[in-house]
Amino acid sequence: MIKLGIVMDPIASINIKKDSSFAMMLEAQRRGYEIHYMEMNDLHLEQGVALADTKVVELKEDPSGWYQFKSEQTIALSELDAILMRKDPPFDTEYIYATYILERAEDEGVLVVNKPQSLRDCNEKLFTAWFPELTPITMVTRKAEKIKAFREQHGDVILKPLDGMGGASIFRVKEGDPNLSVIIETLTNHGQNYCMAQTFVPDISNGDKRILVVDGEPMPYCLARIPAKGETRGNLAAGGRGEPRPLSETDKKIALAVAPTLKEKGLLFVGLDVIGDKLTEINVTSPTCIREIEAAYDISITGKLMDAIERRLKATAM
């Protein structure tokens, strides 16, 4: 029996209709795995050994009570076969410390999904810089005058922090916007923080597409997140609506261009954000949208993920 750990946000407050971590656990349970639930504060290190206070959990597809803890124990993480790191951003120093603890478990033979070092290396906004031919024109800086010059040159632009999620603090700035200076001050914390400027992609009205890539294989369907009327952000958390769709030829091309790098870096489950024909983000921490896509199409994305985990476990056991 496979022992699977999962580090996530509190299970009591998830929305099971939309939660991808819940979908992953349901599939693992269907396969007979023993599931060890953990939150960040359950992880600890002693003399270089990674440990955790875990709760073995059973799940049900029931909005009135979707989980039950069966037992509580403190274990060495090396007792687990695999661990899903599914903690949502913010990607802060606490998150980074947790990846070091998980890396100690990885050193002892545990498969950690996604790979802890790659979680640190591949910032969701900045990692697109390794694929400049696929992205909108992009600049990352702390300097207000550079952002203003970028806006001057490109007209309609998007400004965003490097550490947000769910569309938080994303601004669209057009010519003559009287708020440009205060937006820059807010995003850069008066020149103390980097922020990203990108040319605006008008195709956002047709949706910000979330494309899932499992172990280097793009899934054939995506979730297009359509902005609410008068909005420029498609994020569901910002009021957008999700529309499952098959991948277009352009979507496939973008996903296949990025996929080999993801696989090589041990990023088994990744969400690409694509607007029109431009890659805008590479989400590696806790990508979502599984539930919406699986509800619309005859596909088990979680099944493909567990297959990939089992393949890797078999390969290391040989």
Curated annotation (Swiss-Prot):
Needed cofactors: Mg(2+); Mn(2+)
CC cofactor note: Binds 1 Mg(2+) or Mn(2+) ion per subunit.
GO MF, one annotated term: glutathione synthase activity
Binding positions for ATP per the UniProt entry: 150-207
Organism: Vibrio cholerae serotype O1 (strain ATCC 39315 / El Tor Inaba N16961)
ATP-grasp domain: residues covered: 124-310
Positions contributing to Mg(2+) binding: 281, 283
Known pathway: Sulfur metabolism; glutathione biosynthesis; glutathione from L-cysteine and L-glutamate: step 2/2
Keyword Membrane: no
Signal peptide bounds: none
Protein name per Swiss-Prot or TrEMBL: Glutathione synthetase
Catalytically driven reaction(s): gamma-L-glutamyl-L-cysteine + glycine + ATP = glutathione + ADP + phosphate + H(+)
Domain of life: Bacteria
EC class (word): ligase
Pfam family, one: GSH-S_ATP
UniProt record similarity statement: Belongs to the prokaryotic GSH synthase family.
GO cellular component: cytoplasm
InterPro entries associated with the record: ATP-grasp, ATP_grasp_subdomain_1, Glut_synth_pro, GSHS_ATP-bd, GSHS_N, PreATP-grasp_dom_sf
Keywords: ATP-binding, Glutathione biosynthesis, Ligase, Magnesium, Manganese, Metal-binding, Nucleotide-binding
Protein EC: 6.3.2.3
